[in-house]
Amino acid sequence: MRTYLILSLSLLWATVAQGQSNTDMMKAIMGGQGQVEQDNSPFKPLGFTGSYTWVINSYKGGTLDKDSPMLLRMAFDDEHMAWEPQARPNEGAMRMIFDLKNKVNYTLMTDEKGKRTGVKMKAMRITMNDADHASDKATQVVRTQETKVIDEHTCRKYTYKDEEGSGVAWIAEDVKFNAFEALGSMVGARADRWQMAPYQGMVMENAWTSADGGERVEMSTRDLVIGKVDKALFSTDGYELQDMTNLPVFGR
């Protein structure tokens, strides 16, 4: 669960850092915990159509991070994912599109003057190392009997704990979507571990605290729409694209 939080946050922070290649972003995400390689895995439909917004607050030493809250709009259909962080005042906008079927990704940028540019690159996957997964395997997850209603969905309380920290997640089990599977499209040889999440459903609220109490991350899901999506979020129309799919994948 913590890996899910950290990867999600890292993807959000990476999309804000304009000018980095996908490989550089992936390397920064993993912090040396995995290898970046081209995605040659068989295509598998995502199995979910919809959208939502993540609201993420990070704390250190009990103090809210200056960049919080961070908002990330996410959209899905069988063949695509789109990530769109909320633009800050006087800054350009960015959107990332993951074409799961054709194995290419797009980073689209709109500057302060409205100029639209983008980069097309090969899809990347991360091959995790054994040390990282040893920690994941040791995570203790408990499905409790406690429930509450969030945005008209009955959510069940889960608790989780490992040597790095502990947390509480409220999961809408009626929503047939596994975020581990969606994020797993970016994970390499051991992506099956993402599929072994001890639940099926949408994480509506999640709070993780480090073992020493110095860090805390709170995430909530808002504006959940199921069964339909704005296809424009997967479109590159109107952007001047630079095709970099012929470049070699560095950092393997």
Regions inferred by a protein language model and the residue ranges of each:
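Bacterial Sec-dependent N-terminal signal peptides
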Residues: 1-22
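Extended soluble regions of mature proteins
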Residues: 21-252
